């Protein structure tokens, strides 16, 4: 569906060239929700704006739906952009137009006749849950409602791809989840390919099938979300995963326990998929003559399944602890020894 091959974007500046995107290679399948995550300055906004040619690549090739979009211009590019919707962090609505008129705007530009425009706007207002707000102006809407207008407007021309540029960054957590649920519903109903960029791992976890991690203009890691949660390869990816799997006081809790109980081992168990539902600790205590203390636990739901992390203290004879660890491995649960006495 979407293919990026050796794509580079360089900005010219008085202080020297700035490479925002450095030889990016990506393949995004039709109908999937693909996330790009990175901290500020990683190059993710520059990357997503290359998809619809709001930014021109310095080199490389971008193909969307078998069309080399990086090689077209003029009317052909304008037509291609109608098949690529986009929503933004700060909504980019026309403040002098009502909700209906904002949604209708791209249809006017496309030359759709008035009757068809009205019908399409009615469909979109229903789709995004804005019934009764069609005659309201943006200033009368909440942040979540404004983004719903943005989504409806982006879908007006029945695009194949929806680009989301930090679409939830300006929203509170509850509204963020509502917008993410809406995007997930639209993806399932319409089979729409969604590409989103964010700095929040929660967004990736909640709706994405796969994720690419960017750092200093480079894509440093790519994979299914569940695999990235289970086995992050890069330090930056590990930091993002820890946003969800480790509470802020985990290290303090572990350090306090080590001081209080210098014997035994502190281990982190990682559960993936079906392993989350297994009674691992119950089995551990049944077959091992050791004491088990739970320090911290977390279970996250991703679009591909569950991921869990549990930090426990194992205390007893060394041989019994080793047998317990071997038993945990047999349950297909990953184990990391954090500290040992």
UniProtKB/Swiss-Prot annotation:
The keyword Secreted is assigned to this record: no
GO CC terms on record? plasma membrane
Q: Which GO terms describe its molecular function?
A: ABC-type D-methionine transporter activity; ATP binding; ATP hydrolysis activity
Q: Where in the cell is it found?
A: Cell membrane
* Residue ranges of every copy of the ABC transporter domain listed in the record: 2-241
Q: How does it sit in the membrane?
A: Peripheral membrane protein
Q: Which reaction does it catalyse?
A: L-methionine(out) + ATP + H2O = L-methionine(in) + ADP + phosphate + H(+); D-methionine(out) + ATP + H2O = D-methionine(in) + ADP + phosphate + H(+)
Residues reported to bind ATP: 38-45
Q: EC number(s)?
A: 7.4.2.11
Q: Which cysteines are joined by disulfide bonds?
A: none
Keywords attached to this Swiss-Prot or TrEMBL record, sorted alphabetically, are:
Amino-acid transport, ATP-binding, Cell membrane, Membrane, Nucleotide-binding, Translocase, Transport
Sum up the protein's function in the record's words.
Part of the ABC transporter complex MetNIQ involved in methionine import. Responsible for energy coupling to the transport system.
The family assignment reads: Belongs to the ABC transporter superfamily. Methionine importer (TC 3.A.1.24) family.
Q: How does it assemble?
A: The complex is composed of two ATP-binding proteins (MetN), two transmembrane proteins (MetI) and a solute-binding protein (MetQ).
Q: What is this protein called?
A: Methionine import ATP-binding protein MetN 3
Please give the organism: Bacillus cereus (strain ATCC 10987 / NRS 248)
- As recorded in Swiss-Prot or TrEMBL, the protein's gene is named metN3
């Amino acid at each position: 569906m979407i293919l990026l091959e050796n794509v580079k974007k360089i900005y010219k500046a008085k202080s020297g060239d700035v490479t925002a995107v450095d030889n990016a290679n990506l393949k995004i399948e039709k109908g999937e929700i693909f996330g790009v995550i990175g901290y500020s300055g990683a190059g993710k906004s520059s990357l997503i704006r290359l998809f619809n040619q709001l930014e021109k690549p310095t080199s490389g090739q971008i193909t969307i739906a078998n069309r080399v979009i990086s090689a077209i211009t003029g009317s052909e590019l304008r037509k291609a952009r109608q098949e690529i919707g986009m929503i933004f962090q700060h909504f980019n609505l026309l403040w002098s137009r009502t909700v209906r008129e904002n949604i209708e705007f791209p249809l006017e530009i496309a030359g759709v006749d008035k009757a068809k425009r009205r019908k399409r706007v009615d469909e979109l207002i229903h789709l995004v849950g804005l019934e009764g707000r069609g005659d309201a102006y943006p200033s009368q809407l909440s942040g979540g409602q404004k983004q719903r207008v943005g989504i409806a407007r982006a879908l007006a021309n029945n695009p194949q791809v929806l680009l989301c540029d930090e679409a939830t960054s300006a929203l509170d957590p509850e509204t963020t989840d509502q917008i993410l649920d809406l995007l997930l519903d639209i993806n399932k109903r319409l089979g729409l390919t969604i590409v989103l960029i964010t700095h929040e791992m929660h967004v990736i976890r909640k709706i994405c099938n796969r994720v690419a991690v960017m750092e200093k203009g480079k894509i440093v890691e790519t994979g299914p979300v569940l695999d990235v949660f289970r086995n992050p390869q890069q330090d930056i990816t590990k930091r993002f995963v820890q946003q969800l799997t480790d509470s802020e006081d985990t290290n303090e809790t572990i350090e306090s326990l080590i001081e209080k109980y210098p014997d035994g081992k502190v281990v982190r168990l990682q559960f993936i998929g079906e392993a989350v539902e297994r009674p691992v600790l119950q089995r551990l205590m049944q077959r091992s003559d050791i004491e088990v203390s739970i320090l911290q636990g977390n279970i996250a739901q991703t679009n591909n399944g569950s991921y869990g992390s549990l930090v426990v203290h194992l205390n007893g004879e060394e041989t019994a602890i080793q047998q317990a660890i071997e038993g945990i491995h047999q349950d297909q649960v990953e184990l990391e020894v954090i500290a040992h006495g």
